[in-house]
Amino acid sequence: MTTPPQAGVFPAILHETHADEFVQPFWDAAKKGKLVSARCTNCGTFRLPPAPFCFECQHREIEWVELPGTGRVYSFVIVRHALAEMLQPVVPYASGIVELDGTQGAGSRMIVNFVECDPEKLQIDDRVEAVFERVNDEITVVRFRPSK
């Protein structure tokens, strides 16, 4: 018998990852409570999500850059209807896009879930900060909450 999820907490099964060589450093950093992004060594464009080539110049080499873990709400949606029964306890919740501080270019935004907030009070341009939710020994998920 499985324990039902708590309100606002997504079931662990939704966090299974199958990281490849391009994204593994992101997950390794998250386990340490750090937000990182790949950056093109040729033109400086950020690659989030990490990809095998640069979105701007198609260069292949990257460097991993630690980001401050802050940003602003660029866009969001409030999910009010569970798409699966296991999600019923967590609705409503907010998902959206954060424009990350310390980045520029095509990969400067990240799709996220917002936590520790009333979704109805979330606003475009709100300042937010990363929080790291340890799901298990292998997976730590990056979420965002309103800045304090």
Per-region residue spans from a language model:
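Short functional micro-motifs and their immediate structural scaffolds
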Residues: 48, 62-63
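A broadly conserved sequence feature marking short terminus-proximal activation segments
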Residues: 1-35, 147
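Well-ordered alpha/beta subsegment
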Residues: 103, 109-148
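Short, cysteine/histidine-rich loop/knuckle motifs that typically chelate Zn2+
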Residues: 39-42, 53-59
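Short coil-to-beta-strand transition motifs
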Residues: 63-72, 124-126
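Glycine-rich active-site loops that engage anionic ligands at enzyme catalytic sites
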Residues: 74-116
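Residues immediately within or flanking Cys/His clusters that coordinate Zn2+
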Residues: 34-37, 51
